[in-house]
Structures are given as C-alpha cells and as structure tokens.
C-alpha cells in the first residue's frame, strides 16, 4: 500500500570554491520561436527541473504519477512501479537511459521505482506514434531519460539527508568538478526503512464475542504493514570531456544494489515471522558516447553494457522453527549495446537523419529449488540469447516558417525475424501566431515482439506467439500565451486512435498455470488534455497550476474464443478508462506550499468486466500536501 504520510526533513550543505549562489524567484516568460526541426509533429511531454527535483526522495514513478497523463501502477514506495500510455500495457512502453534501452528483456517492462529522480536531469514522454522517432515497439509510447554535465566550475559537494516517518532515511551525496573541458560528477543515493506504517485494514474483520462465545459485533482492525522493509543503494559516475573543437566524449556508469521485502497481503492472517518473502537485485549500466558536431552536420556513436542479477526467495516456517525454501528464483541478464547516428542540415529547410542501434541479450532464468533432472538441468528455467536490431532514416522538411513535415522509415529485427517496414508521417503548422496556436498530426505503423518470458517461461511460455502489430493515428492542438514577468498560460488537446492485432495476454489454463496467447484485436482510442498556468501575483508571491486529463478506452474487438467468452466489446482488464492529475504551487520568498492530486478510474480484474466485489478495483485517489522552506547556509570559501 502507498504510504499515506511521508514527512521529509532535509538538511542541505553545499560547499563550493566559487562565489555564493543566490536564490532568486524565476518568473515564467512565454518564449515564441521556431519549433526545432527534430520535433516536427512530435507529441511529447517534457518534465522540467522543478518537477524532477521538487522532492528529492521521489522515484521517477512518483514524478510521473503527478506530472503526466500516463497510468502509473504502483504498490507504494520501494515496490514494483510500471507505466503505460494510452490504454496499453507496461510492456508497450519503451524506456531509454542515455540512448540505451533499459526495458527488462524477460518481462518487457521497466521498474520506475528503481530510478531515483535525483539521477535524472532530462526526461520526456513520447506519446503514441511519436515514439517511432526513437525506437520501435512503443505501441503506447516511450520514456526518454538522460543525464547531462553538471556545469560546475571548480569543486563542489552537496549532501542532503531526508528523515521520514516509520524510521525512513534517505541519504543523497553529489561530488562535482568542472573546468573549460572537463565535467565530472559522482552521485549516490541510499534509502532504507522498515516501512511498518499503521493502517485500517478494510479487507479483514475481527469478531467481538460475548461470554458465551457468540459473535455480537465486528470491526476492521488497525494493523501494521508487515514484511515491507527495503534498502536501496544507487551510485552514478559521470565523466564528460569537451575538446572545444566540436568533439564531446562522455561516460555514464550506474550501479544498483537493492534488497526489498515483499509485503504480506492484507488478507493474510499469518505472522511475518513465519516466512521470508524477499527480492534482491544488482544492476550495472554503462554507456560510452562520442559526438562530433559541425555547423550543419553531426555524427555520434555510443556503446554500452548492462548486467542485471535478480533473486526472489520465499521461505516458510514448517511449524518446527525451521525455515524451508519454497522458491529460489534466479535470473541474470547481460546486454551489449551499440549505436551510430548522423544528422545533416541543408539550410534551414531540410534535415536528414539516420540511426542504427543494436542490443544483444544473454538471459538465464531458473529456480534453484527445483529438483534437477539428469544432466543438471532444472525443470523450471531457460537460457536464451537474442539480438535486437533497429534502424531508421528520416527526412524533415520545413517549406515555410509555419509548416513542417517529417517522414520516418524504420525496420527492426528480433532474433532472426524482421518486422515489416515501419513508416511514420508527421505534420505540424502554426495556425495563428497570435496565441501561438499550433496543430499536429501523425500516422504510423508499429510492431512489438513477444518478450523472452512470453516465449520461454516455464511453465507457460508459448514459443508460437506472433508479434503484435497495428496502426496508430494522432492529432493535437496547442496554444501558449503570456506576458513577460506577469503570467504564462499554455495547453494542449490531443486525440489518438490505435488498432492493434494479435494482442498478447496471459490467461489461466486447465493445467493450473497461466500461459500467453494472441487472442485479441484491440481498439485503443481517446483524448488527452493538459494545461499550465503560472502567475506572478506580486514581486514575491507566485502561483503555478498544472492539470492533465486522459480518457483511454481499450476495447477488445476480436472474435470470441468460446461461446462463453464475454470479453468482446469490453475494456481490457487492469486498464483505467480515465485518469487525471492536478498540481498547485504557491511560493513566497523561500517558502513553497505544494498540493498534488491524482486519480485513476475503476479497473476491471476480469476480461468480462464483471462488476462483482472481486471483479473490479475501486477508483484510486491520492493527495500530497507539503510546506517547504529553504534555509541556505553560508558557503565555505
């Protein structure tokens, strides 16, 4: 369960060899200018530095929950958190970090609770067809995360400690050094908590008995979250070198060590001392980059490596004080990454790009608790290698200042199978400079191959699965108005529609386990709304408001599998039809009052959309309120 209250007390010490920084109020200014050629027709949400850094203890799952229209499925802090666009599933969301894809090749998804916002300097969401500009497989969209040079001058040290309720501690450290050519940064985050908060358990009822042991009343018990502790360590090393002659070199290395208990169910009547339910992970990600930049062209290359080791252990007391291993799942992933790209401008009207990337995965998954067969092979598990190749070329044309068009051609290979050509066409135009009213539209094909677990997981994997494929259409209107140092107002409204064939879904079998199959043709459509308002009320008082709303039906339009199949024409399970967020920020001098609210409509747990007590999840609301005051300490010179 999500923690209901988290109070953060931060002590920040900053040491610098340079002159003292000053905290200044930044007033919003609407800047009107030509749209970047790279972004012709692209529908994206860029998260600014305020959203990324306003609460240093946030993971990227928390940031996206309150600052975007996408669906974030989370079970609370330090628990699995996934994101999905436009009524699709988390495996339809492609995620990259400094250009390298970080989707788990076994599951196809990314755990955003494992990404501290403290480690991210730039984040953007590419909605729907716009993801084809970056990669294939993003039937819903893509999330781009990256770091950038610290822009330090000399040595710098930043240390922040967060102390929260339920013995929660967060430690943040950053060391920086910079000059005209070098930028070096080391960041570290350590978070820990027993996470044993109290809550009213409405999934249980305790009986009240009279002296004759007759039930005379019932009540909901107040319990503590059991078996929910966590210890997470993250270290990020960055080195950047700029020759000053158009060449830039970069190194990014990120290490994760996580040890998390998995909380007991709210309907579990056992004691937390009777079992141990734990997930551990060690991950290393490294990216080397080179950029060669000239006035009208650029070439770049990247190479990277990812290693992930994950363990899941489940132990129970047999009743005699001896803990028995029920499950000992182990998996390891090694991924080699390479990418080359180029850009060429012809005047200010044409931009041509080409990109080729490769990810080679080596995956081993097994359960060490399974009795070994002859030859030492486990009954449950697999060992597979799969290459993933993606290449694209594009031409972007801006015949006039107001009009832009873009054509992208992409093709991908997974294993030995190639996708059909993936075309995407984008167009945008300024309808009126008064109000900066712009329109965008796009259309694209897209494909996604099954994950390794979809194909080979034992028991249940289906090696005969087909790839998912379909066409998507987008259209949007946006505006931006404002008066310098007074106010700014911007907003957008977009419509989208996707037709996906051979949708993959895991379903129960008569053999007692789940198995994936291509059973559904899905029609996903809807609208997304977004608005931002910033007002300088006085020289010292400032108000900021942000709101989003999404309506995202995802309907099964396939044929019934059996006469009893009631899923046709129904919303897909676990996909909310509506979601919304509101953020309000009121600042005065060094004080900031912040209110955040998010909402997800009810979700069905059955493909038939059964409305019984167990057939749906109730609507979800969450509010966060915080009051902050920054207290600068005199720098040590």
Which role does the model predict for each range below?
Residues 26-55, 82:
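N-terminal periplasmic "start-of-domain" segments of outer-membrane beta-barrel proteins
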Residues 60-63, 81-84, 96, 110-116, ...:
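N-terminal periplasmic accessory domains that precede
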Residues 100-128, 459:
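Short acidic/polar hinge/loop motifs at secondary-structure boundaries
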Residues 167-192, 204-259, 282-294, 344-352, ...:
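Transmembrane beta-barrel wall of Gram-negative outer-membrane proteins
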Residues 187, 240-244, 438-442, 468, ...:
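Conserved C-terminal beta-signal and adjacent last beta-strands/turns
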Residues 197, 226-232, 245-299, 307-334:
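Flexible loop and strand-edge segments within Gram-negative outer membrane beta-barrel domains
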Residues 294-314, 432, 438-440, 467-525, ...:
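Membrane-embedded beta-barrel scaffold of Gram-negative outer-membrane proteins
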Residues 398-404, 494-499, 518-607:
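Gram-negative outer-membrane beta-barrel transporters
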């Amino acid at each position: 369960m999500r923690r209901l209250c988290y109070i953060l007390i931060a002590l920040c010490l900053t040491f610098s060899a340079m002159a003292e920084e000053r905290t200044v109020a930044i007033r919003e200014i609407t800047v009107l200018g030509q749209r970047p050629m790279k972004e012709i027709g692209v529908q994206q949400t860029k998260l600014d530095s305020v959203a990324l850094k306003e609460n240093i203890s946030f993971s990227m799952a928390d940031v996206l929950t309150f600052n975007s229209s996408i669906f974030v499925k989370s079970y609370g802090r330090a628990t699995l958190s996934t994101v999905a666009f436009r009524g699709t599933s988390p495996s339809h969301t492609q995620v990259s970090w400094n250009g390298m894809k970080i989707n788990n090749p076994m599951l196809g998804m990314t755990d955003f609770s494992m990404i501290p916002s403290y480690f991210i300097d730039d984040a953007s969401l590419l909605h729907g067809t716009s993801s084809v500009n970056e990669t294939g497989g993003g039937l819903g969209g893509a999330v781009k995360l990256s770091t950038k040079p610290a822009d330090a001058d000399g040595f710098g040290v930043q240390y922040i400690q967060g102390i929260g309720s339920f013995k929660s501690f967060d430690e943040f450290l950053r060391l920086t050094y910079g000059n005209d050519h070098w930028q070096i940064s080391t960041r570290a985050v350590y978070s820990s908590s027993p996470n044993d908060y109290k809550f009213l358990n409405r999934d249980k009822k305790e009986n009240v008995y009279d002296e004759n042991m007759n039930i005379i009343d019932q009540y909901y018990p107040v319990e503590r979250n059991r078996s929910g502790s966590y210890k997470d360590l993250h270290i990020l090393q960055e080195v950047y070198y700029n020759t000053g002659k158009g060449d830039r070199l970069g190194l990014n290395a990120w290490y994760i060590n996580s040890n998390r208990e998995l909380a007991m169910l709210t309907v579990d009547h056992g004691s937390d001392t009777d079992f141990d339910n734990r997930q551990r992970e060690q991950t290393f990600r490294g990216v080397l980059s080179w950029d060669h930049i000239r006035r009208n062209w650029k070439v770049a290359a990247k190479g990277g490596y990812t290693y992930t080791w994950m363990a899941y252990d489940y132990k129970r007391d047999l009743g005699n004080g001896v803990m028995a291993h029920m499950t000992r799942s182990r998996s390891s992933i090694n991924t080699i990454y390479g990418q080359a790209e180029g850009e060429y401008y012809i005047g200010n009207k044409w931009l041509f790009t080409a990109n080729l990337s490769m990810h080679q995965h080596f995956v081993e998954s097994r359960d060490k608790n399974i009795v070994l067969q002859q030859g030492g092979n486990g009954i449950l598990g697999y060992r597979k290698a799969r290459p993933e190749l993606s290449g694209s070329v594009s031409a972007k044309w801006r015949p006039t200042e107001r009009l832009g068009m873009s054509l992208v051609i992409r093709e991908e290979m997974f294993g030995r199978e190639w996708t059909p050509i993936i075309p995407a066409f984008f167009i945008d135009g300024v309808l009126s400079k008064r109000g900066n009213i712009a329109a965008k539209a796009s259309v694209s094909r897209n494909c996604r191959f099954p994950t390794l677990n979809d194909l080979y997981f034992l028991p249940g994997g289906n090696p005969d699965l087909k790839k998912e494929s379909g066409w998507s259409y987008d259209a949007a209107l946006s505006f931006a108005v404002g008066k310098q140092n007074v106010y700014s107002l911007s907003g957008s409204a977009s419509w989208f529609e996707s037709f996906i064939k051979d949708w993959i879904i895991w379903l129960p079998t008569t053999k007692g386990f789940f198995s994936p199959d291509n059973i559904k043709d899905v029609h996903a459509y809807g609208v997304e709304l977004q608005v931002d308002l910033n007002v300088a009320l006085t020289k010292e008082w400032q108000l900021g408001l942000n709101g989003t709303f999404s309506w995202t039906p995802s309907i099964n339009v396939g044929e019934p599998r059996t006469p009893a199949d009631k899923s046709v024409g129904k919303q897909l399970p676990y996909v909310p039809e509506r979601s919304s967020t509101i953020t309000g920020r009121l600042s005065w001098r060094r004080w900031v009052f912040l209110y955040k609210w998010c909402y997800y409509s009810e979700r069905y747990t059955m493909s038939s959309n059964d409305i019984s007590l167990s057939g749906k999840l109730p609507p979800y609301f969450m509010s966060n309120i915080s009051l902050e005051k920054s207290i600068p300490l005199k720098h040590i010179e």
